[in-house]
Regions:
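PLP-dependent amino-acid enzyme catalytic core
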Residues: 1-300
Length: 300
């Protein structure tokens, strides 16, 4: 597919939950097929940031994330393709650069700076790094962690095309709140948007989503019961579910967001949350390289 091509060209696949015999019709929009590195929701959230950099001839891009950040991974790959210098400020310590996620970022040309968790959110510490870079190369474009801001949400609203606004529910995993905010804006009350937080104690996300969608109908709900202990946490139940789902539907899902969302959807269906007549569209947000991160950590 062409870079930043219309989301109307992306396949929608029917899926099944093995334990559900009588339930709604489930479909998944395969954003993961756009590209193995910067596909999924990431390319949409980065679209207008990239456009700004290219149109205004800004020298480079800088963003933030954890050592296994999907966002930094996608940004590094996209900047490599487009020939844009990029920088990442990473929450953690120097030894983290050996993990497969950051190894890819470094090989793709991203220059990495580490800030300890204690100082990662410090504007003072971040600005020290940013000022040093700008002294050397001039103005840079800064993207917030996860790519969630007005430009990111505008791009995320394009994950759905106009002719896909005929579903009863739209479902997505939630980390920073940008992608679900884009869905809420796009659907604009046509169907309900269901988000599944991948974070423990992620209730604060509701305030953020509300602020981004205050001019749109409150036709959404964020579930907090399927985080499995917190961000990037798994247990045997979730791992078994992931393997069974992948085998039954001939597609891969990521272990951070989609496995939890899909587990939640199956559980809600068992609890009769949906009508048998409902049509449910799930957004596949990519991020499959997270499997490598889990394998890496399992060996540590």
């Amino acid at each position: 597919m062409e870079l930043f091509d219309s989301s109307a060209n992306i396949p929608i696949q029917r899926i099944q939950f093995p334990e559900i015999k009588d339930g709604p019709s489930f479909f998944i929009k395969r954003l993961d097929l756009i590209h193995p590195i910067y596909g999924g929701n990431k390319i949409f959230k980065l679209k207008y940031h990239i456009a700004k950099v290219q149109n205004e001839k800004i020298q480079a891009i800088l963003s933030f994330g954890g050592p296994f950040s999907n966002h930094l991974y996608a940004l590094a790959g996209l900047c490599q393709k487009l020939g844009i210098p990029c920088y990442g400020i990473v929450r953690g310590f120097e030894p983290y650069k050996e993990n497969p996620n950051l190894q890819f970022c470094i090989k793709a040309g991203m220059q990495i700076f580490f800030l300890s968790p204690q100082y990662f959110n410090s504007a003072l510490e971040r600005n020290k790094i940013i000022e040093e870079i700008q002294k050397e190369i001039g103005p840079i474009h800064i993207i917030p962690e996860g790519g969630t801001d007005e430009m990111g949400i505008l791009g995320a609203s394009e994950m759905l095309s106009d002719n896909e606004l005929n579903f009863d529910y739209y479902c997505i995993g939630v980390g920073s709140g940008g992608s679900i905010s884009g869905l809420i804006r796009k659907t604009n009350g046509k169907g309900r948007v269901l988000g599944f937080s991948a974070l423990k104690n992620g209730q604060y996300l509701e305030e953020s989503i509300n602020s981004y969608t205050k001019n749109y109908p409150k036709s959404w709900k964020l579930f907090h019961d399927y985080h499995f202990g917190g961000f990037a946490k798994q247990n045997k139940t979730l791992k078994d579910f992931e393997r069974t789902f992948e085998a039954n539907n001939d597609l891969e899902i990521d272990p951070v967001y989609q496995s939890k969302m899909l587990f939640g959807l199956e559980d809600l269906t068992k609890k009769h949350y949906f009508s048998i007549k409902d049509k449910v569209l799930i957004i596949h947000t990519g991020g499959l390289q997270a499997k490598n991160g889990f394998e890496y950590m399992a060996k540590k």
